[in-house]
Amino acid sequence: MKIADKTVTRAILERHGFTFKKLFGQNFLTDTNILQKIVDTAEIDKTVNVIEIGPGIGALTEFLAENAAEVMAFEIDDRLVPILADTLRDFDNIKVVNEDILKSDLQTRIKEFANPDLPIKVVANLPYYITTPILMHLIESKIPFAEFVVMMQKEVADRISAQPSTKAYGSLSIAVQYYMTAKIAFIVPRTVFVPAPNVDSAILKMTRREQPLVQVQDEDFFFCVGKAAFVHRRKTLWNNLTSHFGKSEEVKVKLEQALEAADIKPSIRGEELTITDFARLADALREVDLK
């Protein structure tokens, strides 16, 4: 029987006297069909290494290790390390790392794979409270992860994969889609977790683009403009930009010049702009010395 079988999960938790900590946003998946779908979605086979974040008691880790060349699982809760040593004892291709993924030296860690030259995929059931920081940390790192298949709160998955002129579209959509393609693979109901979270989850598949979606003069400034445009969603782009850059006559003249050069109407809302529009706008703002 698999670790994710509900009776097995309960027995493991009881045997080790484990209690859930809200601090770590722990929800363990107890549906083997969904775990298999995650592995299938990620297309895991012996030609790839996997980094897993938040293995819990090893339910997903077990499925990954059966299919991948090697799995490196990052677990922040040191109480789970001996449990993982127990539940995954039959595998010789799993390395459990008791570290916070945000603080880990990943460049050094990935050299510890038996074959570090294999493509690396990230597969994870991310804690809701820290999904975005972890994703952006990994995406912006210099490590060429081939793909991310990540379980997260459905609302966050909607925001990441959203298209312009939709309610969910915003600065997070821009930040991720600049580097990756993003598509929701399937929905995971809250009922298949122990304990059950308050919301449904989604599996989001993100594949790294060979080149960023658009070319910009300054990436940091491009992301900054994207954030500024959504500070007040219901306000116009002009209102958000003057709130960010200032309302002096000099600034307003420069903003008008930049918007005209980028062929963007001041009365438009941020959610109506494509990522290509934002790239033109950011470069035009730099040209008039608004940074």
UniProtKB/Swiss-Prot annotation:
Recorded superkingdom: Bacteria
GO cellular component assignments: cytosol
Keywords for the protein's UniProt record, in alphabetical order: Cytoplasm, Methyltransferase, RNA-binding, rRNA processing, S-adenosyl-L-methionine, Transferase
Top enzyme class: transferase
Major localisation: cytoplasm
Keyword Lyase recorded: no
Positions annotated to bind S-adenosyl-L-methionine: N27, L29, G54, E75, D100, N125
Record-level Gene Ontology MF annotations: 16S rRNA (adenine(1518)-N(6)/adenine(1519)-N(6))-dimethyltransferase activity; RNA binding
Protein name: Ribosomal RNA small subunit methyltransferase A
Organism per entry: Streptococcus mutans serotype c (strain ATCC 700610 / UA159)
Name of the gene encoding the protein in the UniProt record: rsmA
